């Protein structure tokens, strides 16, 4: 598979990144299934109707770090919350912070308003401002009255630190890269691993990055879908678990050459009609899925979760002074909790399973998780289905 910056869009001097995905497999393809609920068609956040994902990968240069020039191992990932009018029909939203070492732009307004009025973007720590500015410009291009005759737009941007592999002083994610990710956002299968915002990320001392998964409830429980997308850059090797198996302890002798404490951003989507309080409760269950993979939210980790419901959209302008919006009973919400925890756990492991080895600045290397050893261990513990 050939990946280019912007996946062949908006790539100025960036060179193609040749990667062989033939040896990488998602967790279910290895015979390991998390929980009892079935995934959606794509086992991705895009199984929630209307949700789209776009990536831009910025990957160029090699060798020693030249500050401000490269090598670049970074990118941007965007999530479109629905396929309609994202400005005028806000999705109900909430957030939860497990450990706040870092930041996520826009969370204050999400907590205050209970909604999201545009895309969600993920990128590297130093470029939250750059990506936010690009998102504002993109939204203005779609809605020219923003900030003039209409309200101003508050972008939502999450970050993780990719400086162990990336020239973090180079600010390599440009406006055209953000625009390309936004314009190229699509439904269907989602690229995972070292792609987009996940290009320079490491997780449990293996190559990490973008991962996704979904769960579909039974018709008796409403038939709703929960989808999760993560950018994982967290954890120590010995903490790592897959379906309860202490994989990290068994693989400690295969340490990667780069170790740096990092973070994780988790995005939870559902089509169940939830109010903001209920979405926040889903976000808290995503933290349980994170914990199942071994994370204890280390002091130096920033663990940020944002969630939204496409099934309860809030009109920006309405002639009605009282709105009647659908809302799921709390008595029916427990299956969504299980779906969220399971999908989060699997999304994180999918990121590890799908990521290739990446050599970054100064030869720093983040090594791909050895899938043959993982399968061997999971079979030993009786966790494989085949």
Regions found by a protein language model. Give the residues of each.
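Sec-dependent N-terminal signal peptides of Gram-negative exported proteins
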Residues: 1-11
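Alpha/propeptide regions of enzymes that mature by internal proteolysis
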Residues: 11-386
């Amino acid at each position: 598979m050939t990946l280019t910056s912007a996946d062949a869009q908006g790539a100025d001097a960036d060179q193609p990144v040749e990667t062989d995905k033939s040896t990488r497999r998602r967790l279910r393809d290895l015979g390991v299934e998390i929980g009892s609920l079935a995934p959606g068609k794509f086992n991705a956040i895009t199984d929630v109707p209307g949700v789209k994902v776009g990536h831009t990968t910025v990957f160029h240069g090699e060798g020693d770090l030249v500050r401000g020039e490269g090598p670049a191992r970074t990118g941007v990932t965007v999530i479109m919350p629905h396929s309609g009018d994202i400005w005028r029909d806000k999705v109900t939203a909430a957030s939860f912070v497990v450990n706040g070492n870092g930041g996520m732009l826009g969370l204050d307004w999400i907590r205050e308003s209970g909604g999201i009025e545009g895309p969600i973007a993920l990128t590297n720590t130093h470029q939250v401002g750059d990506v936010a500015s690009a998102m504002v410009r993109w939204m203005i291009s779609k809605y020219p009255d923003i900030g003039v005759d209409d309200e101003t737009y508050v972008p939502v941007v999450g970050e993780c630190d990719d400086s162990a592999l990336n020239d973090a002083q180079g600010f390599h994610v440009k406006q055209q890269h953000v625009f390309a990710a936004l314009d190229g956002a699509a439904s269907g299968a989602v690229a995972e691993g070292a792609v987009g915002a996940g290009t320079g990320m490491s997780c449990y001392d293996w190559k990490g990055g973008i991962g996704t998964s979904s769960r579909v409830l039974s018709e008796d429980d409403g038939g709703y879908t929960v989808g999760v997308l993560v950018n994982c850059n967290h954890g120590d090797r010995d903490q790592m678990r897959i379906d309860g198996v202490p994989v990290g302890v068994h693989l400690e002798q295969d340490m990667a050459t780069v170790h740096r404490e990092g973070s994780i951003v988790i995005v939870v989507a559902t089509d169940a009609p939830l109010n903001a309080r209920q979405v926040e409760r889903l976000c808290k269950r995503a933290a349980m899925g994170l914990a199942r993979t071994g994370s204890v939210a280390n002091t130096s980790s920033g663990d940020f979760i944002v969630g939204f419901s496409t099934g309860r959209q809030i009109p920006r302008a309405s002639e009605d002074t009282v709105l009647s919006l659908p809302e799921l009973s709390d008595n029916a919400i427990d299956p969504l909790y299980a779906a969220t925890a399971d999908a989060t756990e699997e999304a994180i492991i999918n990121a590890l399973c799908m990521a290739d080895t990446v050599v970054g600045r100064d030869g720093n290397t983040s090594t791909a998780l050895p899938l043959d050893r993982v399968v061997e261990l999971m079979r030993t513990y009786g966790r494989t289905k085949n």
